[in-house]
């Protein structure tokens, strides 16, 4: 996201992975149908990236990422921004993450070297393939 912003693309990062420190609950309430879209507040980082984050506590255990509301929201944001980047939850622990991947034009899988096995990668690749998600790359990071 920062690279796109430095290239002067209007960039939005939608962080669905977890609660961000101080995340506003407006986005989660909107996804749950308890608030209108104007309740969604983006924070702007010093590098110019706009960020919208989930507030998981506000979701009361509901799986909201596979919703039509999120799909519509992302489509609207694609019209407003040059680049919309979605940080999805861990594919190993959240079935909704696969639904989010289906909404994206491109998918890059990131995994920590010490927490992933070849079997995990095979299962993730197979599930993404079965869901017609094109994987553009895999980034393995960490010690």
Regions found by a protein language model. Name each.
Residues 89-90, 112:
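Short glycine-/small-residue-rich Rossmann-like dinucleotide-binding loops
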Residues 12, 52, 104-143:
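Conserved beta-strand/loop subsegment of P-loop NTPase cores
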Residues 2, 6-83, 90-102:
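P-loop/Walker-type NTP enzyme "switch/lid" segment
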């Amino acid at each position: 996201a920062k690279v796109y912003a430095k290239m002067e693309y209007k960039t939005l990062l939608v962080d669905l992975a977890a609660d961000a420190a101080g995340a506003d609950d407006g986005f989660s309430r909107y996804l749950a149908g308890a608030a209108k879209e104007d309740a969604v507040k983006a924070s702007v980082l010093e590098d110019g990236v706009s960020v919208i984050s989930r507030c998981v506590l506000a979701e009361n255990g509901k799986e909201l990422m596979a919703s039509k509301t999120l799909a519509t929201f992302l489509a609207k944001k694609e019209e407003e921004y040059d680049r919309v980047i979605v940080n999805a939850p861990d594919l190993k622990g959240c079935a909704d993450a696969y639904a989010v991947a289906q909404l994206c034009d491109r998918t890059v899988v990131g995994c920590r070297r010490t927490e992933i096995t070849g079997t995990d990668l095979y299962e993730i690749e197979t599930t993404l393939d079965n869901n017609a998600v094109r994987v553009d790359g895999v980034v393995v990071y960490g010690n």
